[in-house]
From Swiss-Prot:
PANTHER family the record matches: ACYLOXYACYL HYDROLASE
This protein's encoding gene: AOAH
Top-level class of the enzyme under EC nomenclature: hydrolase
GO molecular function, one term: acyloxyacyl hydrolase activity
Residues in coiled coil: none
Location of this chain's protein in the cell: Secreted; Cytoplasmic vesicle
Protein name: Acyloxyacyl hydrolase
Amino acid sequence: MQSPWKILTVAPLFLLLSLQSSASPANDDQSRPSLSNGHTCVGCVLVVSVIEQLAQVHNSTVQASMERLCSYLPEKLFLKTTCYLVIDKFGSDIIKLLSADMNADVVCHTLEFCKQNTGQPLCHLYPLPKETWKFTLQKARQIVKKSPILKYSRSGSDICSLPVLAKICQKIKLAMEQSVPFKDVDSDKYSVFPTLRGYHWRGRDCNDSDESVYPGRRPNNWDVHQDSNCNGIWGVDPKDGVPYEKKFCEGSQPRGIILLGDSAGAHFHISPEWITASQMSLNSFINLPTALTNELDWPQLSGATGFLDSTVGIKEKSIYLRLWKRNHCNHRDYQNISRNGASSRNLKKFIESLSRNKVLDYPAIVIYAMIGNDVCSGKSDPVPAMTTPEKLYSNVMQTLKHLNSHLPNGSHVILYGLPDGTFLWDNLHNRYHPLGQLNKDMTYAQLYSFLNCLQVSPCHGWMSSNKTLRTLTSERAEQLSNTLKKIAASEKFTNFNLFYMDFAFHEIIQEWQKRGGQPWQLIEPVDGFHPNEVALLLLADHFWKKVQLQWPQILGKENPFNPQIKQVFGDQGGH
């Protein structure tokens, strides 16, 4: 699963053609292209493809196509301004090359955003030109021979070095690294701001100047004078003088939901409209600034902690919304502690962002769902980089000990197993990617090969034409799942009960097929890897039903006072 500071600033902006970043750890493998070069190449090919296809769809010049793309982008985050800066810098050469029938691969190699290092294979997304690659590239370089652009591109210049963008880039980078809200006046890890790790990720603060006021805490003096736990229930019933919090919530077993996850749990999503020329319009990019400041994640629509109405038209709700429906006293008590690229190995770097006080707060349901990155990487040989069962045991035990020292007594922890990711190749490899649908010139197999060649694939092991490698990856995933299962069966902790649940994606596929759907419709169309919103909500439904059947004590009681809470407090202040 992606760990993309570079993709965050390049692909989503569509303009990250020369960005350098430090979000991903340095790699000791010198044979691997630098992450900066790999992601920059992907960003360039994506942008040039969109420009070329916009010209085709609208029967316009390349110049008009570039201007059209910029006109679609919002002013927020200087997206439109940055787009015009890029056109000014690179536009004339892109026009010359596309006018000479060079494809996006050739354009990006000519402008040196893609580079073939000595001894390395040629990485290309589209079919190779009919003439030899060497001849085509020489021809393209002659076309732009006198251009000052190549000097600029070689300099490694960073879009974030532009004064207008420096602060924005820094904000996003800080939020990603620390996994706590950037805007948090009282430093209680809760915010009144939605993105940059704000209330899209954890319940909205209702008093950002008082660190003792935050979602999930036990009420202070039954919230007679203020709403100390932000669930929208406070004050005193004038009829009998009993505090509403005491009347409606005492003994109802309130609890929160906390997800420790990766990009799947955070709901990584790149909208197909952003790269599909035939669907592109002024409305396509309205939500791009929000997505950028959420690291291309959509936790507000995720299966675990989503609180907004689904955008995909199915009736299933997130686990958090089901907990709220069961007991309205649980309002706003959710935390999505997920990061792109997270695994059992690096969870310790951001688990401190979890907010729970053993004494002051209600118990929590914690879902540990590191479902991919312990077997996934972009390395040319991904098998040695996979987490071993022994190392997973050590990592998870360290996490559980941390949870035991922070969670209130009566909490519950569920360890999620890993999926069998062979369904990705099986269901997508021969289908056209959104970028390839217009001209029927690019399948998911080509996308996977391109990303693997650049060593920026989110999961080389499963996104590979090599069946043996796909099988090995699934075998290791099964071994790790069995390790989690053994931990749940044998380990005991004082402050929480421990459970294990299979990541039963095959059951989700079967359920979707019963409704007339196809398996490929459950996968994110742009990256061809992550479960999409439909899949995440179906997984939440599967989780809820299994827990209800096997471990109903995890969910707490149904609150008989829910109707009265709604009558007195309406939507409880919303989310």
